[in-house]
C-alpha cells in the first residue's frame, strides 16, 4: 500500500496544492489528513497566503485523485468541518500491509508509552506537534509527518509517504527529513 499523509495545513492553499501535486505524481491508495486543516489557531501566526475560503474546492480536487481519510484537529471548529467536503472523525483505523495504524491529530493521546487501551504493534500516525517523528518505543510506533505550513524546532515544511512498511517524511524540495521502517507486527526494523 502507498499512503500519503499531511498535517497542520492551517488554511494555507499553497500547502494543499503542493500535497495535491504529490498525490497526482505518486498515485497513492489513500491520503490521510491529520487535522488543523483550515484555521491557524490562537497560538500560531497567520500563515503567509492564508486563504481558508478557497480550500474546500482544493480538497475536492484532492478527493478526485485518491480516497481521503481525515481526522479533526484541535483547531478544526465545527464550522470548519462543515466546509470540508469529506467527513472528519476524531480518529481512524487504517489497515496497511498488516499494520494497524491509528490516525489522529494527536492532541488527546500521550507521546510515549504506556498507551492504555492499545496493543503493542500499534502504529500511531499523528500531527499536532508540527515536528516530524518516526520511532518505535516499547513496541509502539509513532509517526508524524510534521507540518505542511508552520513547522517548528527548525524543521522544514514537510509531508510523508508510507510504502512497504516504511514511513518517509519529505521536505518540499524532495529531500528526506527522516525514514522509519516497521515490520508487520509494528516493531521497528
Predicted regions and their residues:
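Core catalytic region of metal-dependent phosphoesterases/phosphodiesterases
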Residues: 2-96
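Structural motif
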Residues: 3-5, 32, 101-105, 125
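Histidine-centered divalent metal-coordination motifs
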Residues: 10-12, 74-75, 105, 126-130
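Flexible, glycine-rich phosphate/dinucleotide-binding loops
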Residues: 40, 77, 110, 151, ...
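Short, well-ordered secondary-structure micro-motifs
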Residues: 41-45, 80-84, 89, 113-115, ...
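Generic structural signal for conserved hydrophobic packing positions in ordered secondary structure
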Residues: 59, 94, 103-105, 146
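Conserved beta-sheet core of the metallophosphoesterase superfamily
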Residues: 100, 107-173
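Charged phosphate-binding loop/patch that engages nucleotide di/tri-phosphates or the phosphate backbone
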Residues: 163-189
Amino acid at each position: 500500500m502507498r499512503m500519503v499523509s499531511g498535517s497542520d495545513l492551517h488554511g494555507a492553499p499553497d500547502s494543499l496544492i503542493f500535497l495535491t501535486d504529490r498525490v497526482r505524481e505518486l498515485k497513492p491508495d489513500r491520503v490521510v489528513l491529520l487535522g488543523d486543516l483550515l484555521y491557524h489557531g490562537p497560538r500560531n501566526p497567520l500563515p503567509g497566503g492564508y486563504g481558508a475560503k478557497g480550500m474546500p474546492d482544493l480538497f475536492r480536487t484532492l478527493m478526485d485523485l485518491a480516497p481521503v481519510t481525515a481526522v479533526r484537529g484541535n483547531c478544526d471548529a465545527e464550522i470548519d468541518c462543515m466546509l470540508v467536503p469529506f467527513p472528519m472523525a476524531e480518529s481512524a483505523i487504517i489497515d496497511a500491509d498488516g499494520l494497524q495504524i491509528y490516525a489522529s491529530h494527536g492532541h488527546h493521546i500521550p507521546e510515549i508509552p504506556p498507551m492504555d487501551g492499545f496493543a503493542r504493534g500499534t502504529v500511531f500516525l499523528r500531527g499536532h506537534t508540527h515536528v516530524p517523528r518516526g520511532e518505535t518505543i516499547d513496541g509502539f510506533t509513532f509517526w508524524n509527518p510534521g507540518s505542511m505550513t508552520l513547522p517548528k524546532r527548525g524543521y522544514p515544511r514537510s509531508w510523508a509517504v508510507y510504502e512497504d512498511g516504511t514511513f518517509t517524511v519529505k521536505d518540499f524540495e524532495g529531500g528526506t527529513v527522516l525514514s522509519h521502517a516497521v515490520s508487520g507486527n509494528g516493531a521497528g526494523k
